[in-house]
Swiss-Prot record:
Belongs to the chorismate synthase family. The gene is aroC. Pathway: Metabolic intermediate biosynthesis; chorismate biosynthesis; chorismate from D-erythrose 4-phosphate and phosphoenolpyruvate: step 7/7. Keywords: Amino-acid biosynthesis, Aromatic amino acid biosynthesis, FAD, Flavoprotein, FMN, Lyase, NADP. NADP(+) binds at residue 47. FMN binds at residues 124-126, 286, 301-305, 327. GO terms for cellular component: cytosol. It catalyses: 5-O-(1-carboxyvinyl)-3-phosphoshikimate = chorismate + phosphate. The keyword Zinc-finger does not apply. InterPro entries: Chorismate_synth, Chorismate_synth_AroC_sf, Chorismate_synthase_CS. It comes from Synechococcus sp. (strain RCC307). PROSITE patterns: CHORISMATE_SYNTHASE_1 (PS00787), CHORISMATE_SYNTHASE_2 (PS00788), CHORISMATE_SYNTHASE_3 (PS00789). This is Chorismate synthase. Reduced FMN (FMNH(2)). Its cofactor is FMNH2.
Amino acid sequence: MGSSFGHLFRISTFGESHGGGVGVIVDGCPPRLAIDIEAVQAELDRRKPGQSKITTPRKEDDRVEALSGLLDGVSLGTPIAMVVRNKDQRPGDYKEMQVAFRPSHADATYQSKYGIQARSGGGRASARETIGRVAAGAIAKQMLRQLHGTEVLAWVKRIHTLEANIDPAVPTLDAVESNIVRCPDAAMAEQMIERIESIGRDGDSCGGVIECVVRRPPTGLGMPVFDKLEADLAKAVMSLPATKGFEIGSGFAGTTLLGSQHNDAFLPTSDGSLHTATNNSGGIQGGISNGEPIVLRVAFKPTATIRKEQQTINASGEATTLAAKGRHDPCVLPRAVPMVEAMVALVLADHALRQRGQCG
């Protein structure tokens, strides 16, 4: 329960951080699509640990194995199973956390719900669970690009109190990947890196905001009233670890505008397609995509597992303290960029198939 996502383009992830491996089954991918497994690997490389001085030092190759659903790089229309083996587990780092709950982590709520949990490495609450999502999202990206010419791109917009002012129409993948924090503003990226390093040296952590744009999305995605596109996007990205907020288009800032300022005026086009003068709606109106770029932002909290001593309780409810050991990200944002892209791509792929099924 709770490990599957989607309707027609449906995924199920499996595995724990310190188990034998993690992976995903993708069901519903159309047949006869060219699927580049190295493109899947490239996405996993963007999210893997140990990639820079501001991420966890855990060393994992995160090499993906495609077990089914592909033949000579072409989708068969049958379930695509992919797995990544875990290799660098250190259960000993979690001895203290097996008797004391990490504040603001899933340890306590998992124990309360199930009466048992895989505390070593965080189990299903670990960010390693997102390997399956990123692998599946890479398949969804390839489908969207081939069938609709759609691009999904995200970047770090804010780290702690440092925020970059970025026009969503400008960033490229090369610009995002040009630095280890994945912020396309090079000057701001340097400040962000220094901030993460400083906070990490103090044994603490920080959060921030990731912005994502969908360029050339199909028109008509989304269904009234409970399957609105932005509602499904919100559910998708808010299911990622450490997420605490979501906004689309003008978001909360739009509440300060008047209707005459916020409304996106329609403009005539030669082909009769929808086009607006502004994009405060973020590419979605009435829960349905209008063809303009979809722009959304996701807030991530500071990493819960930190080296600073904190007050907590043990499994018996007794007061204790915890200074966590192990290898943990001082900031999840740089590695979360491909995770956000993956979840957005999965929603769009699913809705594209649903739109084709209902409306042709």
